[in-house]
């Protein structure tokens, strides 16, 4: 059954920040053919977290509508380093690092994308064939003034911070990727808008129909404030154990839950709207959070793993009388981690480290429902825990890297 274009547009726009241009997309959809959907990933971080999957989820939505995904691994651009949103020059990766990280990407993306509707491509396939003259011709299509329109370049120029010449090539090469792939739509984060529009301009320059651009928001981490990232310690990795994944999802605030559902859930919009109506009529948001956490764990593991994670969570937490609205704490730690006694003092669960050590000796401290007996225990960056002292004191704590 053919889905009306208006309904397709609604599905495509779900959760997106911007769609450029909607009338052009309607014209492409009216051609009634599989569109070529491009999203590029520089293999700088081999392990994906849920923040990375926002783009992949949108690609999956488009696949469900019958379109073809072009999962572009920027092995060539990865050796340049994308400067988007950065105030300093990023060091390039070696070809060996890029190859190793690219393999890890391929092992993970098919947990979301349909393999039969996905083409994994590497931009070195066409970029390695360009000679010096070709690159100079590509660079000649745009001016330095145009490049300085990009926010991060402009700020660095105004503050006299260095901009390497090769960094100007990055948006040009990303744009040329769209030419090489004849992309109909390109997806990217809001911080990539300049580069995505570069693809439209270069396609027009090379006599192609310009791609539509869909920008997706950057997913907030567990703290609900900063972008999800490993360095901030507020992430959920897609290869984490079912129990860790489930527990972290259950730890997010009720407000953040709706944001995660909008960007990460595959449940139909009518179902999500019904959930919102139910909560408005008095249903406990925790019930919805359980359904959402089970969906995500099932996607990256299995239904059986999700059910086991729920059972474990209920046995350790819900029967332990943990309140719904736990205070949120974001604590910093160095490479050695944060000592448990310092954590208890900094969160105010104990008045001093001496009291903290005494409570541990007495068996009155739990992390994620498990009793702590080691007074020298340290929590590492990236950990998210629910801490309990005695029967009535609780806190939710995220450990991030010391700045």
Swiss-Prot record:
- Residues crossing the lipid bilayer are none
> PROSITE patterns from the xrefs?
AA_TRNA_LIGASE_I, S4
Q: Which CDD domains is this protein grouped with? A: S4, TyrRS_core
**Keyword NADP among record annotations:** no
Source organism's superkingdom? Bacteria
- Give the quaternary structure: Homodimer.
Protein name listed in UniProt: Tyrosine--tRNA ligase
Species assigned in the record: Nitrosospira multiformis (strain ATCC 25196 / NCIMB 11849 / C 71)
- From the UniProt record, report the name of the gene that encodes this protein: tyrS
